[in-house]
């Protein structure tokens, strides 16, 4: 567990961290200091922060490193982090998740959140995921009281298709060109330039009390909507209800 690796992390003195924490870690393995306000959830079966507590832990290590740097007369440093989390962590309408989000922005900046394709981990876990990008060690609220602007990407269609036994397979157009390559270039362009594009991206100044998903801020591109889109949404919702046992096939 990373909770036992603080000395290793401090010695490594990272500039970039890539992390994919467990979405449903058992609370028993999480340090008590992070569970003070969890109530009954601290004795539950799943991490009520949906993985945000792991980000909080690494953030605390970076802050500890910066305090030590200041004592030694050195400049503070920042660390870039990209972390995969379930979308539930970004929505954060439950008190425990919202408290984690608020705490995270005290010492760190939320640079970007990307909503990822459905079943991105196929044929593995079926969780709906997003990627959050933080600058650890730099408060989200500037010294003058203004907020950093966050980029939000609705990156659901990446040009891959699910294939049984093969996973998600890259697709090509009639000329043999990779569909993903063209999509990747567009995604990088809107992100690097903080562009707002209907149906794809948006920027917003958010706090820990807000939703951290593009769907809450982007404008819909109605010119691309088809009847099939509505049918697909209904089909997905029906599949979800069946999976959760809320309805049953007769």
Predicted regions and their residues:
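A conserved structural/catalytic subdomain of Rossmann-like adenosyl-cofactor enzymes
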Residues: 11, 15-250
């Amino acid at each position: 567990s990373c909770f036992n690796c603080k000395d290793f992390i401090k010695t490594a003195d990272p500039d970039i961290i890539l992390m994919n924490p467990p979405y449903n870690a058992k609370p028993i393995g999480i340090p008590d200091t992070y569970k003070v306000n969890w109530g009954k959830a601290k004795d539950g079966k799943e991490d009520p922060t949906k993985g945000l507590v792991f980000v909080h832990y690494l953030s605390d290590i970076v802050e500890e490193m910066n305090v030590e740097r200041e004592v030694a007369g050195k400049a503070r440093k920042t660390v870039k982090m990209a972390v995969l989390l379930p979308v539930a962590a970004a929505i954060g309408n439950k008190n425990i998740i919202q408290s984690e989000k608020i705490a995270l922005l005290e010492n760190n900046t939320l640079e970007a959140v990307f909503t990822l394709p459905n079943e991105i981990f196929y044929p593995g876990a079926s969780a709906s995921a997003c990627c959050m990008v933080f600058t650890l060690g730099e408060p989200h609220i500037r010294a003058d009281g203004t907020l950093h602007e966050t980029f939000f990407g609705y990156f659901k269609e990446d040009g891959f298709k699910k294939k049984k036994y093969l996973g998600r397979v890259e697709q090509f157009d009639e000329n043999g060109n990779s569909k993903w390559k063209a999509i990747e270039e567009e995604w990088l362009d809107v992100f690097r330039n903080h562009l707002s594009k209907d149906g794809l991206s948006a920027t917003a100044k958010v706090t820990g009390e807000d939703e951290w998903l593009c769907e809450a801020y982007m404008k819909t591109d109605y010119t691309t909507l088809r009847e099939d889109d509505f049918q697909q949404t209904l089909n997905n919702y029906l599949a979800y209800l069946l999976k959760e046992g809320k309805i049953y096939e007769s």
